[in-house]
């Protein structure tokens, strides 16, 4: 007697909730943090999956834009300046992260139009 009952099938290999949802972010860890954080008395099974998907999407969006900013500056490594440029040049991300200060991010280059030198018209010859 093997002690496995009538079926006789071996237990399937454990599959993480992240891999089931097709995500890279940890669903189990987010679920644990939601339960621990006293956000609500109970946490549904779908809530951490949804939150992990949203966080993964936002991270991918910021990283893609920051990678483009790094490539524009002929750099192969993303630095805080590239994150700052990526976020502040994107309207929706800028609105979402308007209250966030990025250390070593610098500022966006911006010169008011009235401060620019006036265009002088050359005499026609």
From Swiss-Prot:
Compartments (UniProt record): Nucleus; Chromosome
Family annotation (InterPro entries): Histone-fold (IPR009072), Histone_H2A (IPR002119), Histone_H2A/H2B/H3 (IPR007125), Histone_H2A_C (IPR032454), Histone_H2A_CS (IPR032458)
Keywords per UniProt: Acetylation, Chromosome, DNA-binding, Methylation, Nucleosome core, Nucleus
Positions of transmembrane segments: none
Record-listed N-acetylserine modification sites: 2
Listed Basic residues bias regions: 1-18
Gene3D superfamilies from the UniProt entry: Histone, subunit A
SUPFAM superfamilies assigned: Histone-fold
Subunit structure: The nucleosome is a histone octamer containing two molecules each of H2A, H2B, H3 and H4 assembled in one H3-H4 heterotetramer and two H2A-H2B heterodimers. The octamer wraps approximately 147 bp of DNA.
Protein purpose: Core component of nucleosome. Nucleosomes wrap and compact DNA into chromatin, limiting DNA accessibility to the cellular machineries which require DNA as a template. Histones thereby play a central role in transcription regulation, DNA repair, DNA replication and chromosomal stability. DNA accessibility is regulated via a complex set of post-translational modifications of histones, also called histone code, and nucleosome remodeling.
Stated name of the protein: Histone H2A
Species in which this protein is naturally found: Mytilus trossulus (Blue mussel)
Lineage: Eukaryota, Metazoa, Spiralia, Lophotrochozoa, Mollusca
């Amino acid at each position: 007697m093997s002690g496995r009952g009538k079926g006789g099938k071996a237990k399937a290999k454990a599959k993480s909730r992240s891999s089931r949802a097709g995500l890279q972010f940890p669903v189990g860890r987010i679920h644990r943090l939601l339960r621990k954080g006293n956000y609500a008395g109970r946490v549904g099974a779908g809530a951490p999956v949804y939150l992990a998907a949203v966080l993964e999407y936002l991270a991918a969006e910021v990283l893609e834009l920051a990678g483009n900013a790094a490539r524009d500056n002929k750099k192969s490594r993303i630095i805080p300046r590239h994150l700052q440029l990526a976020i502040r040049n994107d309207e929706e991300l800028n609105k979402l992260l308007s209250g966030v200060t990025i250390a070593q991010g610098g500022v966006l280059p911006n010169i008011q139009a009235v401060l620019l030198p006036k265009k002088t018209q050359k005499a026609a010859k």
